[in-house]
Amino acid sequence: TAGRPLLDTHKTSGDEKGNFLKNAILTKKTDVDVEEVYAEYVAQMEKYIKLFGHKPTHIDGHHHTHALPQTIEATRRLAKAYDIKYVRHVDSDVAFISDFYGPLTDYSQFETTLKRHLDREYVELMCHVAFIDVDLIQCSTYNFDRVHELETLIGSQAKAYIAELKIELTHFASY
């Protein structure tokens, strides 16, 4: 839902300038070619593996587009082809915290958010942390907020709170 695809073969999931369709447009489209989406997913997966030397631990598309009715078949095929066990689904039984964003990323919000989910075995906290570089500044308006999220999550208060509650931080490969 942002930027250019790796492949230049997009006829149903790209715009006239060759960019991915914006989320608001993609969610309303009914003629998205699943094979086109799958080919792009494979290209992105192969690039990821080439860059990092391993496959990712999970699949989660920008703006959760991987779980749209128009794309979910391609997502399932990709997960099976690459033996990826965890695919982020909007209707998952894993508690999903999506409101840790922008002005809601200070420590008190972090604590309040975690308290709401203490009864759950697994909780996924969506965040947008990053180290800012020129490329990110050029393609996103959500920049310094990312730094703020990072500082909140690695700060001493958050670490102490996590330790106090005996919360185990894991990653998708352990799920």
Segments (PLM) and residue ranges:
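Terminal accessory/targeting
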Residues: T1-F52, H58, H66-Y175
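Active-site histidine-anchored catalytic micro-motif
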Residues: H63
